[in-house]
Regions:
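Accessory terminal alpha-helical modules
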Residues: 1-167
């Protein structure tokens, strides 16, 4: 379900994510730059994190089982796009740093998030002009909404960024 060669996915593709978006989200999760390498421990941690995210994303599981098309997920849901994946990676970074003992349990709350693109929260943060925005600000604002859904206090920087949310 990963597009290995291209940096975007065509409308009719059966792929869910690009390799590039997975790499970006994992770098955000581990706080790494594009030139950094991963230790064996970091690789294991990232693998565990993404496996637990998958277990808490019923739509992704349905796509793997071919109970829903990836095209439909991309049309209707934020979590089926790189911007959503990247925001989940950023959320994971916060969880790993601030909740090292409970982050696994916290991920269960991902199931209760309304990931539909029509959710007004995403319209204001990730889709300010009616289409997905992949800007750094949009990714961070999306992550802020995830933090709020998981009852994670926003940092001072996050709070300042919240002032940019379209009301």
């Amino acid at each position: 379900f990963t597009e290995m060669e291209k940096s975007n996915i065509s409308t009719l593709s059966n792929k869910l994510f690009t390799l590039s978006s997975i790499k970006q989200a994992t770098r955000a999760l581990l706080g790494k730059s594009s030139k950094d390498t991963y230790t064996a421990e970091e690789t294991a941690l990232a693998t565990e994190f993404w496996q637990l995210v998958y277990l808490n994303m019923p739509d992704w599981q349905m796509a793997i089982k071919k109970e829903v098309s990836t095209m439909q997920l991309r049309q209707e849901y934020l979590h089926a796009h790189g911007v959503g994946l990247h925001a989940i990676g950023l959320l994971g970074r916060t969880l790993l740093c601030e909740r090292p003992d409970s982050w696994r349990e916290d991920l269960v709350k991902l199931k209760s998030i309304n990931w539909r693109k029509t959710n007004p929260e995403w319209m204001r943060r990730t889709m300010p002009h009616g289409k997905l925005s992949k800007t750094t600000i949009a990714i961070h604002l999306t992550c802020n909404a995830l933090k709020q859904a998981l009852n994670i206090p926003l940092s001072p920087e996050d709070s300042v960024l919240e002032q940019q949310v379209i009301k």
